[in-house]
Amino acid sequence: MLTSLQRHQFLFEELVKRDFKKKYKRTVLGAVWSLLSPLMMLLVMRLVFTQFFGRHMLHYTTYLFCGNLVFAFFNESTSQGMSSLMGNASIFTKVNVPKYLFLLSKNVQCLINFALTLCVFVLFCILDDITFTWRWIMLLYPIGLLVCFNIGMGLILSALFVFFRDIQYLWSIFTQLLMYMSAIFYSVETYAPDVQNLFLLNPVYLFIRYFREIVINMTVPPLWFHALMLADTLIAVGIGCFMYKKYNHRFLYYV
């Protein structure tokens, strides 16, 4: 895959540029929307949920931002990745290029948006009197795994979308449910231990919790937590690669 990516480096770079420009085409603020969108969502969540869930929670704004930051990246990457094949059918039906390039270009564009939002997140942490420690370097672990997890889910969803167009509506409903099951605006500590363990089945919650442990609690999660995140990522990437390899030759007949 790396050799193929290097061989088509120019095409890949052009796809990333095209996707980024296309997203903000005919907008006045352009890429600034990458910063305003999560900030607006954060503001709404803070106004709505503070009185219900954050009244006695320290650094609740940062707590919300951690959840919103991770979930927004996951949601955007998977939603964009799902349509990556269908949206570029006019290219790969005429030119023989690796189809995963389109998915990777979407993920790189989403990663750029995530990086911009992450800069704003750091500023919010400063305003919220968050203590910066050496543990922040450990955030590279969940970010790296989340990128891979998004790619794996994108491979699965893009393959399914070629054959089943209804998947876009089902995924939209699923992500809405997932948002409420990822403890973005509430704490799982209020639930019984057995219920708290159920949240560990949600990979997105694991990434969110890792961020909060480092940023707010200033602790590094235990080794088993790292292993669980890695396992979820490997499963997603493994299934995604399997589906891509199995159905790759059939995509041309359904787009």
Report residues per predicted region.
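Hydrophobic transmembrane alpha-helices and immediately adjacent juxtamembrane helices
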Residues: 1-255
